[in-house]
Amino acid sequence: MDKKPLDVLISATGLWMSRTGTLHKIKHYEVSRSKIYIEMACGDHLVVNNSRSCRTARAFRHHKYRKTCKRCRVSDEDINNFLTRSTEGKTSVKVKVVSAPKVKKAMPKSVSRAPKPLENPVSAKASTDTSRSVPSPAKSTPNSPVPTSAPAPSLTRSQLDRVEALLSPEDKISLNIAKPFRELESELVTRRKNDFQRLYTNDREDYLGKLERDITKFFVDRDFLEIKSPILIPAEYVERMGINNDTELSKQIFRVDKNLCLRPMLAPTLYNYLRKLDRILPDPIKIFEVGPCYRKESDGKEHLEEFTMVNFCQMGSGCTRENLESLIKEFLDYLEIDFEIVGDSCMVYGDTLDIMHGDLELSSAVVGPVPLDREWGIDKPWIGAGFGLERLLKVMHGFKNIKRASRSESYYNGISTNL
């Protein structure tokens, strides 16, 4: 079945959804050959690619959103239309919409739940070449299938959460087995302790630290200059990136005081380095940085409040989309990660190239110049992209939750430390 372009999807609902999942009511929009010019009821304006594969188009097809824009005053009827409208099929579902979501009451631990199979399949491409610079996940103890001779005992939600925390991506364990929770927990704890023993004996390298070193080597070997900039930045830098108090991203900034904040991205200081190095270094200028960033995120499954980014950029000659895509391909092939490139847009840069692994966005890449460049004194062509290292690790090692790849006291290399 053909995917409908974005203009058809928004025409069917009269709504627009931002990158943060906020539904806006559209006041007016115009469609050119490849662009859509949108004016929201709240007064915001947007120019986006008329794409079939961008994040917003996918969300429209799956009828998913997080909240509504209060200034747009999206009605229940509008939401009902968004949830039930199908532009790719003739089947419709009647949905009852209420203004506020209902809060589910917590189920007491004494109430039993029906057992369900729990499995953590590895989603990343398996690597058998141990000579590569990318670390391979620690091997778990081989799993022997357990015969099912009696009905499985019911597990509470907290017990299921405990089992999920102890599972490794290589475990293939079904909860439809006649094992009490304590016995199952004991078996998984033993496996994880064995994993730690092997890791301590054979490797001793943290996945995130190892990936940082491998990425640094990749870019230095390709003549990029490594940058290490301050984590505390002037709040004015954020405003110059177009993030003012009216934007959604502004609410995610960790502010130290009225003049300083923790950097939410690496771009501001890289902009400054490009401007200064342009007076010193020969053409083209190629720089990169690997370091932590901070945002107040609410969606914990794919986002972290403290995360690690790599941003690379080149300014001057050779700054074409073809060269950017070639470098991205070389980088992800180096990490043995499958991907596809789709067009999208963002509030800061406008048109972007989204680097996707399935439904997971790995990066947004940009071909400059863009209007924002004037704020930083940049007047030359440039290309660049940013990747979240924890997301790369999640794909590389098949982690179900991104917290397993993060700076954490609860997990080490994806293994629970609460044993």
From Swiss-Prot:
UniProt catalytic activity = tRNA(Pyl) + L-pyrrolysine + ATP = L-pyrrolysyl-tRNA(Pyl) + AMP + diphosphate
Name the enzyme group at the top EC level. ligase
What UniProt keywords are attached to this protein's entry?
Aminoacyl-tRNA synthetase, ATP-binding, Cytoplasm, Ligase, Nucleotide-binding, Protein biosynthesis
Alphabetically, the GO molecular function entries are: ATP binding; pyrrolysyl-tRNA synthetase activity; tRNA binding
Q: Where is the composition biased (Polar residues)?
A: 125-143
Question: EC number(s) per UniProt?
Answer: 6.1.1.26
The record's subcellular locations are:
Cytoplasm
Say what the protein does.
Catalyzes the attachment of pyrrolysine to tRNA(Pyl). Pyrrolysine is a lysine derivative encoded by the termination codon UAG.
Identification of the protein by name: Pyrrolysine--tRNA ligase
* Annotated gene: pylS
